Amino acid sequence: MHGALSLETIEPRAVLEDDVLTDLRVEDKDRAQELIEDLMIAANRVTVRYLEARSLPSLRRILRSPDRWQRIVELAAHLGARLPPEPDAAALEAFLLTRRQADPVRFPDLSLTVVKLIGRGEYVVEGPDQKTSPGHFGLAIPAYTHSTAPNRRFPDLLTQRLLKAALAEHRAQYSLEDLNTLAQHCTEQEDNASKVERRVQKSAAALLLESKIGQRFDAIVTGASAKGTWVRILHPSTEGRVVQGF
């Protein structure tokens, strides 16, 4: 999608054979998947614009301008690039594209660092009498919502209900107070789900590597400090802190 940050994070999926974990595999994204994602973003933008044009409330998906932008500037400087002193999505995207071409193997690690520094997304309510949405920094657009996956995300279901009421010219079944409460709840539950996902991924990695103690793997050092050295094993796709080595 034009203007969106070209980030590439690794999301390994568990491979099971007869209910036994045998691998953690990263599926390569093809152009068809990228096209589907672009269409979903376009649909979300049209949905929120439709509700806004009719002065109806909407549940916005936002990503604020990063408070830790200076850390991103320092990261870019360490890699020989310059970013402006104030948050600038277009400049960050140009930097990311350059780094993807220069070092594709380590680009996912850079992307993950940038994602952490930018911060998490949130849900907020926007309505005729409540203008609070700062837009979506990662997509570089002023108005965005989630609406294309009502089967697995409650915010999408809420938006579908608001859209259905608007199309039928009925009053929305949620007041602004209701929507504000639901927006906060959805943000909190998303954070909780993300924590569980990370713990499950770490548990799966530990379970898979338990039988591989003593083996050698190709890996990339992703970080080092007084607390230790962190590496990402290329295959199976896992990462963690080195606790013993030479």
Regions found by a protein language model. Give the residues of each.
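Electropositive polyanion-binding surfaces
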Residues: 1-246
